[in-house]
């Protein structure tokens, strides 16, 4: 077999510098392209820790970012795979977050808010024209190109972005950030490009008064507010906002996505395209003061999550931040991205690996079996007479003395599989295992057992760490008409079902 040459293009062409940010499986560092001296931001993903699903998402993000070339979008310049790592080389944006810049300004008006949202709408319109839905528009993803006055707003982080055909509406999964989720996503209805416009409405509302339109300590009540479109323009802060600004917000925060304003339509709205004559130029000190508090809350939430990640308690952090609808939770986590889009696919992944394990058993392939099982596999099974079995030796006996010596065809069906996902790297599956085979006289036989298996993902691979099987223990003495290891007197579990 020919050897594969390992790519070292990133290592050869780029020099890495300080860390700019960190995620669960990635780190962002400043880098320089050695031949040109040009500086960039490198997102470095540890691919050894990624599941097949994560690899697909990485490929999707790179594909989308390569497609989008716009002054108001952080541009991807290079995408390089090396041994164990993938490098995404982006624009180096040095201006920080838009919302942090606003509170540092001496003067901030409605006209400034109009200019900000115009740039955001330009980026969203470019995405939509190219069949891309961002799905996670929020202040954290709105950056400034530099610290210079009048620097361009740049839309960042396309990790949740999806590709759509035209005005396609479909269920792409529950994804986004709680305070910015649209009613159709919360209703679990088909959705598409309009979800980004709803988020733009939330952002514009905050830009004008410094606090969000939807807010509640209880996440269930927050979601009820959003689904009902229950927001208003309270006095006195909204009294000084022009009717045209409120009109644009109303058009963006329209519950029915079919009637919601599009990005291209919003760019033609008088408050945007006739800013100099329509938008107020009055300084909004109250907005700046409220926005400072809003930013402080966001930073506190981010610091809490970072601490959880640093203490390697990421699963616990995600379980806290990803409560299901109806669970009481402070919206202090409302700037944290949620993604449940691939729950169905992840459950199918568990069913598939369970089927692979059973196939290894049926084939008497102990080598394949050990690759799928944790070396410290624990099990409760009838043959152990109520004792907890640990390790592979107990199972090795059946492979060496029955399974590998059997040449009879075996067919196994998994019935009614129920998968429980426990965080990102653990799952439990319960199912009925139906096994068909031919007995010594050539007659078809079927046996049934009820099984539960616990799976844990390590380095991107699922391993069975525990299982529990029902049934009666195999009787060691068998009638002569039945081949060794195939069935006991009562027709209960055969040796190939002991593992």
From Swiss-Prot:
<feature type="modified residue" description="Phosphoserine">
    <location>
        <position position="333"/>
    </location>
</feature>
<feature type="region of interest" description="Calmodulin-binding">
    <location>
        <begin position="291"/>
        <end position="301"/>
    </location>
</feature>
<dbReference type="GO" id="GO:0042383">
    <property type="term" value="C:sarcolemma"/>
</dbReference>
<keyword id="KW-0723">Serine/threonine-protein kinase</keyword>
<feature type="modified residue" description="Phosphoserine">
    <location>
        <position position="319"/>
    </location>
</feature>
<dbReference type="InterPro" id="IPR011009">
    <property type="entry name" value="Kinase-like_dom_sf"/>
</dbReference>
<dbReference type="InterPro" id="IPR017441">
    <property type="entry name" value="Protein_kinase_ATP_BS"/>
</dbReference>
<dbReference type="Pfam" id="PF08332">
    <property type="entry name" value="CaMKII_AD"/>
</dbReference>
<feature type="modified residue" description="Phosphoserine">
    <location>
        <position position="315"/>
    </location>
</feature>
<dbReference type="InterPro" id="IPR008271">
    <property type="entry name" value="Ser/Thr_kinase_AS"/>
</dbReference>
<dbReference type="GO" id="GO:0043005">
    <property type="term" value="C:neuron projection"/>
</dbReference>
<keyword id="KW-0112">Calmodulin-binding</keyword>
<feature type="modified residue" description="N6-acetyllysine">
    <location>
        <position position="318"/>
    </location>
</feature>
<keyword id="KW-0547">Nucleotide-binding</keyword>
<feature type="active site" description="Proton acceptor">
    <location>
        <position position="136"/>
    </location>
</feature>
<feature type="modified residue" description="Phosphoserine">
    <location>
        <position position="330"/>
    </location>
</feature>
<comment type="similarity">
    <text>Belongs to the protein kinase superfamily. CAMK Ser/Thr protein kinase family. CaMK subfamily.</text>
</comment>
<keyword id="KW-0472">Membrane</keyword>
<dbReference type="GO" id="GO:0005516">
    <property type="term" value="F:calmodulin binding"/>
</dbReference>
<feature type="modified residue" description="N-acetylalanine">
    <location>
        <position position="2"/>
    </location>
</feature>
<dbReference type="GO" id="GO:0106310">
    <property type="term" value="F:protein serine kinase activity"/>
</dbReference>
<dbReference type="GO" id="GO:0005737">
    <property type="term" value="C:cytoplasm"/>
</dbReference>
<dbReference type="GO" id="GO:0033017">
    <property type="term" value="C:sarcoplasmic reticulum membrane"/>
</dbReference>
<feature type="modified residue" description="Phosphoserine">
    <location>
        <position position="490"/>
    </location>
</feature>
<feature type="domain" description="Protein kinase">
    <location>
        <begin position="14"/>
        <end position="272"/>
    </location>
</feature>
<feature type="modified residue" description="Phosphothreonine; by autocatalysis">
    <location>
        <position position="287"/>
    </location>
</feature>
<protein>
    <recommendedName>
        <fullName>Calcium/calmodulin-dependent protein kinase type II subunit delta</fullName>
        <ecNumber>2.7.11.17</ecNumber>
    </recommendedName>
</protein>
<keyword id="KW-0703">Sarcoplasmic reticulum</keyword>
<dbReference type="GO" id="GO:1903076">
    <property type="term" value="P:regulation of protein localization to plasma membrane"/>
</dbReference>
<dbReference type="InterPro" id="IPR000719">
    <property type="entry name" value="Prot_kinase_dom"/>
</dbReference>
<feature type="region of interest" description="Autoinhibitory domain">
    <location>
        <begin position="283"/>
        <end position="292"/>
    </location>
</feature>
<feature type="modified residue" description="Phosphothreonine; by autocatalysis">
    <location>
        <position position="307"/>
    </location>
</feature>
<feature type="modified residue" description="Phosphothreonine">
    <location>
        <position position="337"/>
    </location>
</feature>
<keyword id="KW-1003">Cell membrane</keyword>
<keyword id="KW-0067">ATP-binding</keyword>
<dbReference type="GO" id="GO:0048168">
    <property type="term" value="P:regulation of neuronal synaptic plasticity"/>
</dbReference>
<feature type="modified residue" description="Phosphothreonine">
    <location>
        <position position="336"/>
    </location>
</feature>
<feature type="binding site">
    <location>
        <position position="43"/>
    </location>
    <ligand>
        <name>ATP</name>
    </ligand>
</feature>
<feature type="modified residue" description="Phosphothreonine; by autocatalysis">
    <location>
        <position position="306"/>
    </location>
</feature>
<dbReference type="GO" id="GO:0005524">
    <property type="term" value="F:ATP binding"/>
</dbReference>
<dbReference type="GO" id="GO:0010613">
    <property type="term" value="P:positive regulation of cardiac muscle hypertrophy"/>
</dbReference>
<feature type="modified residue" description="Phosphoserine">
    <location>
        <position position="494"/>
    </location>
</feature>
């Amino acid at each position: 077999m020919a050897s594969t040459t390992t790519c070292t293009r990133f290592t050869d062409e780029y020099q890495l510098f300080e860390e700019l940010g960190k995620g669960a499986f990635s780190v962002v560092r400043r880098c320089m392209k050695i031949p040109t001296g040009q500086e960039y931001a490198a997102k470095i993903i540890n691919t050894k820790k990624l599941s097949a699903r994560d690899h697909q998402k990485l490929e999707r993000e790179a594909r989308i970012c390569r497609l989008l070339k716009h002054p108001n979008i952080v541009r991807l310049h290079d995408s390089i795979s090396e041994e164990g790592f993938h490098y995404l080389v982006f624009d180096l944006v040095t201006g920080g977050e838009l919302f942090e810049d606003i509170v540092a300004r001496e003067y901030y008006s409605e006209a400034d808010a109009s200019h900000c949202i115009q740039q955001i709408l330009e980026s969203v319109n470019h995405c939509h024209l190219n069949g891309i839905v961002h799905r996670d528009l929020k202040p954290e993803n709105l950056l400034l190109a530099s610290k210079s006055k009048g620097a361009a707003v740049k839309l960042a982080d396309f990790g949740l972005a999806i590709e759509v055909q035209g005005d396609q509406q479909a269920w792409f999964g529950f994804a986004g950030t709680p305070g910015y989720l649209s009613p159709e996503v919360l209703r679990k209805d088909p959705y598409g490009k309009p979800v980004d416009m709803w988020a733009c409405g939330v952002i514009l509302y905050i830009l004008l008064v410094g606090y969000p339109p939807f807010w509640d300590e209880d996440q269930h009540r927050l979601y009820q507010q959003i689904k009902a479109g229950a927001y208003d323009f309270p006095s006195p802060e909204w009294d000084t906002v022009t009717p045209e600004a409120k009109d644009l917000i109303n058009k963006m925060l329209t519950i029915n996505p079919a009637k919601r304003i599009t990005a291209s339509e919003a760019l033609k709205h008088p408050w945007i395209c006739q800013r100099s004559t329509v938008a107020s130029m009055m300084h909004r000190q109250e907005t700046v003061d409220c926005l400072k508090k809003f930013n402080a809350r966001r930073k506190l939430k981010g610091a809490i999550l970072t601490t959880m990640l640093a203490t390697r308690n990421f699963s616990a952090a995600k379980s806290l931040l990803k409560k299901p609808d109806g669970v009481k939770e402070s919206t202090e986590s409302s700037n944290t991205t949620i993604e449940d889009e691939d729950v169905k696919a992840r459950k199918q992944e568990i069913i598939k690996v369970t089927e692979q394990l059973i196939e290894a058993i049926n084939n008497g392939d102990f080598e394949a079996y050990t690759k799928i099982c944790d070396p410290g596999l624990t099990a409760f099974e009838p043959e152990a007479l109520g004792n907890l079995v640990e390790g592979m030796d107990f199972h090795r006996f059946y492979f060496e003395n029955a399974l590998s010596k059997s040449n009879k065809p075996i067919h196994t069906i998994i019935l009614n599989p129920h998968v429980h996902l426990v965080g990102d790297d653990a799952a439990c599956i319960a199912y009925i295992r139906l096994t068909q085979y031919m007995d010594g006289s050539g007659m078809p036989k079927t046996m049934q057992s009820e099984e539960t298996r616990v799976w844990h993902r390590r380095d991107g691979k699922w391993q069975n760490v525990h299982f529990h099987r029902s049934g009666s223990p195999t009787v060691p003495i068998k009638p002569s008409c039945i081949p060794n290891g195939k069935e006991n007197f009562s027709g209960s579990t055969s040796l190939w079902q002991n593992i």
